[in-house]
Regions:
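A flexible loop/linker signature enriched in serine peptidases of the S9 family
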Residues: 1-7, 15, 20-29, 34, ...
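Flexible glycine/proline-rich, aromatic-decorated loop/lid segments
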Residues: 63
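Acidic/charged, solvent-exposed loop-and-adjacent secondary-structure segments enriched in E/D, K/R, S/T
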Residues: 103
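Signature of short aromatic-glycine-proline-rich micro-motifs recurring in repeat-based ectodomains
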Residues: 121-130
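Extended repeat-based solenoid scaffolds, especially LRR ectodomains
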Residues: 130-136
Length: 177
């Protein structure tokens, strides 16, 4: 059985040092830096199912941000304004520290003028997610294609329509692509 912990590696004067930050006898994984680089967020299953935690770089001041019980939290990411985004039970959620998680409502708007069968696409089953640097858009992969949705409006656009499986989505630092 795997039991991952989180470590910090530092390089000073061509010498690398390692410091163990978490030591839970289970899974702690997927760390991401906070905006101030003085702490980090990560996923831990220490309370039964994976949830989002935050702690300082020395492992102190640990705080649990989400409290899901049925299923694990997956695909943790963060925007430059501190908005965290994650997958839970096939849906996409966002949360800011000290607030309750919000499910991202996703609906598809089309420009089609012909009478065609319109498929309703929901975020259920999304396999990867990424938050734009300003926190206003969320990209996700659903059934192998990339979609982008607004966190402020009910607009979702399908970006790709290929036979290939898309993967490893992310926003450019300027948020334009």
């Amino acid at each position: 059985s795997i039991t991952r912990d989180i470590w910090i590696s530092k390089k000073e004067n061509n010498e690398r040092t390692y410091q163990k930050i978490t030591s839970f006898n289970g899974e702690d994984r997927n760390p991401i830096w906070s905006n101030d680089n003085q702490s980090f967020y990560y996923l831990s299953e220490k309370n039964g199912s994976f949830n989002i935690f935050k702690c300082n770089l020395n492992g102190s001041n640990e705080m649990q941000l989400t409290h899901h019980t049925q299923h694990p939290v997956r695909f943790l990411s963060s925007s430059k304004n501190g908005l965290l985004c994650y997958g839970y039970e096939g849906e996409i959620y966002t949360v800011k520290e000290g607030q309750q998680p919000q499910k991202v409502a996703i609906s598809i708007v089309t420009d089609q003028t012909e009478t065609e069968l319109a498929h309703q696409i929901k975020s259920s089953g999304a396999t990867e997610i990424a938050v734009s640097p300003n926190g206003k858009e969320v990209a996700f992969i659903l059934h192998g294609d990339v979609f982008v949705t607004s966190t402020e409006y009910k607009t979702t656009k399908q970006i790709t329509d290929t036979p290939e499986q898309e993967r490893s989505i992310d926003f450019a630092p300027d948020g334009r692509s």
